[in-house]
Amino acid sequence: MAELATIARPYAEALFRVAEGGDIAAWSTLVQELAQVARLPEVLSVASSPKVTRAQVAELLLAALKSPLAAGAEAKNFVQMLVDNHRIALLPEIAEQFEALKNEREGAADAEIVSAFPLDGADLDSLVASLERKFKRKLKPTVEVDSSLIGGVRVTVGDEVLDTSVRARLASMQAALTA
């Protein structure tokens, strides 16, 4: 996975530089759409077929997009470059790295919150507000429920993990008692 990230990084950075000259949010939507299309096994199959020309693959990808940017020269050139270099399968990773660059520019970060119980609006807002103070940046939360945590939450922001779950505390106590 690390090597995919290494290969995808220059593409994401180049696209982000293009996006900085316009609407970054619109480019983010475009790259997310491209990533969704590239995840389809049928698209990867067509892209690797020797019977289909590179221009046809690029046209197929662009035709599947709803974004108005897809008609622009920059988007067409980007897609054609990916097709020519056999990098269509990298689009999900490129999209992920593009989002990371966008978040960095906005002073924001994605936060993965795993809770033992479902979080409703007020509880989630309160938790996100306190996490934003702790991490000193705007967070974009995604919430999952995992009852095996027993209680509490586990929050992942970038490479930082804050685990206040009962399961983690029990594991810590067990480690302390057996040491």
Curated annotation (Swiss-Prot):
Keyword Repeat: no
SUPFAM superfamilies, alphabetized: N-terminal domain of the delta subunit of the F1F0-ATP synthase
A GO term from the CC aspect: proton-transporting ATP synthase complex
Localization per record: Cell inner membrane
Alphabetically ordered keywords of this record: ATP synthesis, Cell inner membrane, Cell membrane, CF(1), Hydrogen ion transport, Ion transport, Membrane, Transport
Quaternary assembly: F-type ATPases have 2 components, F(1) - the catalytic core - and F(0) - the membrane proton channel. F(1) has five subunits: alpha(3), beta(3), gamma(1), delta(1), epsilon(1). F(0) has three main subunits: a(1), b(2) and c(10-14). The alpha and beta chains form an alternating ring which encloses part of the gamma chain. F(1) is attached to F(0) by a central stalk formed by the gamma and epsilon chains, while a peripheral stalk is formed by the delta and b chains.
Entry's family note: Belongs to the ATPase delta chain family.
Identification of the protein by name: ATP synthase subunit delta
Gene that this sequence comes from: atpH
